[in-house]
């Protein structure tokens, strides 16, 4: 069973926390992590790209010159794909790129990402994180005490004060435990979680 150090907001170690093997101690499956990241990026795509075919380009209704007798090549429209300014053949059109991996694969990918952070020592657990009001300066102080400047900050539930305090700090992203995804975990150097967030992750993804 993996254990991690438990810190207070002053950056001092106040104990250790045992993590569940089935969440934070699984074998890291890199191909599954790759699949999960590709899925996440595909699902973020808007898919609004578009090109006009010869029937959609403005103009080109009249035959540019008669079929025979001019000595020039025969053409029926100035919007043929052969012409500059003409339509596009087989160009991109709006489409939906989103898809979903099987639930078991998604869960395995998330557990692999969390386990990878534990293995590399890039997970920090806070005993408690409470702010009376949104205060970016106070959040920056806490992160500085932890020697963190690029991290995913995970809370157990939606915490307006923490979210508003952290969202203006560069390279820091606040997120709720139930909304964790593989891409965010891997995209940031450190994973900073509250003790309650760890319990919530173990409850939701067990």
From Swiss-Prot:
SUPFAM superfamilies: Ribosomal protein L4. Keywords: Ribonucleoprotein, Ribosomal protein, RNA-binding, rRNA-binding. It holds the Pfam family Ribosomal_L4. Belongs to the universal ribosomal protein uL4 family. GO terms for biological process: translation. The lineage of its organism: Bacteria, Bacillati, Bacillota, Clostridia, Eubacteriales. Residues 48-59 have a biased composition (Basic and acidic residues). One of the primary rRNA binding proteins, this protein initially binds near the 5'-end of the 23S rRNA. It is important during the early stages of 50S assembly. It makes multiple contacts with different domains of the 23S rRNA in the assembled 50S subunit and ribosome. Gene3D superfamilies: 3.40.1370.10. Part of the 50S ribosomal subunit. It comes from the Bacteria. GO terms for cellular component: ribonucleoprotein complex; ribosome. It comes from Pelotomaculum thermopropionicum (strain DSM 13744 / JCM 10971 / SI). Residues 48-77 are annotated as: Disordered. This is Large ribosomal subunit protein uL4. The keyword Protein biosynthesis does not apply.
């Amino acid at each position: 069973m993996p254990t991690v150090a438990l810190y207070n907001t002053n950056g001092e170690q106040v104990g250790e926390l045992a993590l569940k093997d089935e969440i934070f101690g699984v074998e890291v499956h890199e191909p599954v992590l790759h699949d999960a990241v590709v899925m996440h990026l595909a699902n973020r795509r808007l898919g609004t790209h578009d090109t006009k075919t010869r029937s959609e380009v403005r103009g080109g209704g009249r035959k540019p010159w008669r079929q025979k007798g001019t000595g020039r090549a025969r053409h029926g429209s100035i919007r043929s794909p052969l012409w500059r300014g003409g339509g596009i053949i087989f160009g991109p059109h709006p489409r939906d790129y989103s898809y979903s991996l099987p639930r078991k694969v998604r869960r395995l990918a998330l557990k692999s990402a969390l386990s990878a952070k534990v293995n590399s020592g890039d997970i920090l657990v806070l005993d408690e994180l409470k702010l009376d009001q949104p205060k970016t300066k106070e959040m920056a102080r806490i992160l500085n005490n932890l020697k963190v400047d690029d991290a995913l900050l995970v809370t157990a539930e939606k915490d307006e004060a923490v979210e508003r305090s952290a969202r203006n700090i560069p390279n820091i992203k606040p997120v709720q435990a139930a909304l964790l995804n593989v891409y965010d975990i891997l995209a940031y150097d450190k994973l900073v979680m509250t003790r309650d967030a760890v319990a919530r992750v173990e409850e939701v993804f067990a």
